[in-house]
């Protein structure tokens, strides 16, 4: 599910920096979950789009490309006000799949020296 090649590249393989970026991702993922929940409950399309943009960017850095692709799609859809009936399923995809990605990253971070 996760490809850390990009993270390795941007950190130049520095383990301390890599750990720091992963830890930051954990915090951001939790914030993103909360933002999606609030935005969806309030039917705030602009906030859904902004949150999808952040989710896309953070998951791309971590190499969680399947989620990043869905978030990019959601972002584009909100920008163009297209098919709002699909927003909940894409948000649910993030909410349902990010815990497994986080767990996989926890395993990876534990392997680092």
Model regions: which residues?
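An anion-binding catalytic pocket shared by soluble metabolic enzymes
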Residues: 55
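Generic amphipathic, hydrophobic interface segment in small proteins and small subunits
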Residues: 30-51, 102-106
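Amphipathic, coiled-coil-like alpha-helical segments
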Residues: 2, 18-27, 32-33, 58-73, ...
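Short, charged, low-complexity loops and linkers
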Residues: 6-17, 50-51
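Short helix-adjacent coil turns
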Residues: 13, 36-48, 62, 81-85
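Short linear capping/connector segments at secondary-structure termini
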Residues: 52, 72-75
